[in-house]
Amino acid sequence: FNADAFPRLGSRELRDARPTAPLEIHLAGFSQTVLPGDEDNLVSHIFQDTESLLALHRFCWWPHCVGEDTASWVNVIFDSWVRRFGDDRDGWAWHPYTVAERLINLIKFAKVHGLPGEKVETLTFLSHHGAAIFSHLEYFGENNTGNHLANNGRGLFLGGLELGLDQWADVGGRILIEEGRRIFTSNGLLREGSSHYHLLVTRWYAECWLTA
């Protein structure tokens, strides 16, 4: 992986940007006002609901933040998160579905605001996400594999395109194609029969198509 070759992320990096105003953060059933300097407490918070914890790990909360300090807040929370969970590969933080979501959300953030942290370190960190997905693909046989495998493919495909890693994109694309045949019926409906998941998974495929 060459951290100097990232064709679609731009060159801006946030490095030492620090927030000066409070953050209102919303995490799947959990909301809190975070004061500048309290990011470590947020990252180490013991959540009652696992979905709130997963939302933190996935960085899916950042698009819903408002205010001029959003980028600075993501910068310091990212730094705190990496120090706390970057090497803790056995917990929820590195579950493959969550890894794919975090990779995609951080890439989206970088395209809007710049890379959190220092460029080479952050890109190297992002490159570790591919191996975490590859080594834990969520395939559990024809009858026990849900839609998570398609999301694994989405993470590899979009991450590969944005980071210039062709192998990721190739494998991710193949997973998406094969899973599309398996999880959708011939008339385009998700076999699970859930309208919620149908919209979610359809959005995944549309996102990959538009990015390609």
Predicted segments, located by residue:
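Short, well-ordered helical secondary-structure segments
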Residues: G10-L14, N41-Q48
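Short alpha-helical hairpin
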Residues: H26-V43, A55, V74-S80
